[in-house]
Amino acid sequence: FKINDNESSFFKNWDFNLSPFQQWSIRALLENKNALVTAHTGSGKTIPAEAAIIHFTNKNKRVIYTSPIKALTNQKFNDFSKKFTNISFGILTGDNKYNPEADVLLMTAEILRNTLFQKNILKQGNICNNELLSFDFDFENDLGCIIMDEAHFINDFERGRIWEETILLTPSKIPLLLLSATLSRPEELAKFIENRGGPEVYLCSTVKRMVPLYHNGYITIPDSYIKQFNDDERKKYLKRKMRGRRSYQVEKDW
C-alpha cells in the first residue's frame, strides 16, 4: 500500500498509525468509491466513518449515518457531536427529530429507506409535497456519502430488505460506506452494490481479531445432586455438560 501525498496529509487527522483496512477504506472515500468494511470487533471501524464525516463536510457535502437500532444512533450522535464540535449533527429516530438541516444526519435505517422511497414516488408522479418526508435536501448534489453501520443486518430475514432497498434507491453516484464485524460472504454484497452501477467497491477486511474472544460456560445444578458426587465425578459431569464449548472453568470448592 503506497500512500500518496493527499492520503498522507489526511491520515494526520489521527495521532496514531492507521491499520491497512482503515487506510484502504479512506482511500476509497477520497476517490469517491464505495467501501465495504468487514473488520473484527475492536479493530477500529469507527475511523472510516469519522473519515467520511471529515472529508465530505470539508467539501461542503452532507453525510447520512444509519444504524439498525435507536440506541446505537443516539450513542453515535453523542460521540460524534463531542468529537467534532465544528460540525453540526442532527438525529432522526421514531422518538426524536433534532436539527434535520445539519451537516451530518444520524438516523435509523428505516427512516432513510422510507425517505428514499417517498422521494422516488414524488419524483415519478411529479408531486412536490415535502411534508411527507422526514427530511429533505437534494441528494444528487448535496449528499456526499451514506454510512451504513451494522451492515450485516442485510442478511436478517425480517429486516434485510430495508438495507437492500436503501442501496437500490440511493443514487448510484453517491458513495456508500458499509461497516460490519460479522458479515458473511462480503464479496457477494460488494457485487450487489456494484451491479447497481456507479463506482466500484473497495472490500476492506481484517484477518486477525484484535480483541481475543473467549467462550465460557457456567452450569448450576441443585445442591442435592452435588452431594451425590465426589470431586472427580463432579468434574466429569461438568465436562460432559460442557462438551462442544471452547473452554470451561470448574470451581474446586463448591
Which role does the model predict for each range below?
Residues 27-34, 45-59, 79, 164-170:
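Walker A/P-loop NTP-binding motif
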Residues 41:
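The conserved Walker
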Residues 109-111, 119-177:
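SF2 helicase catalytic motif II
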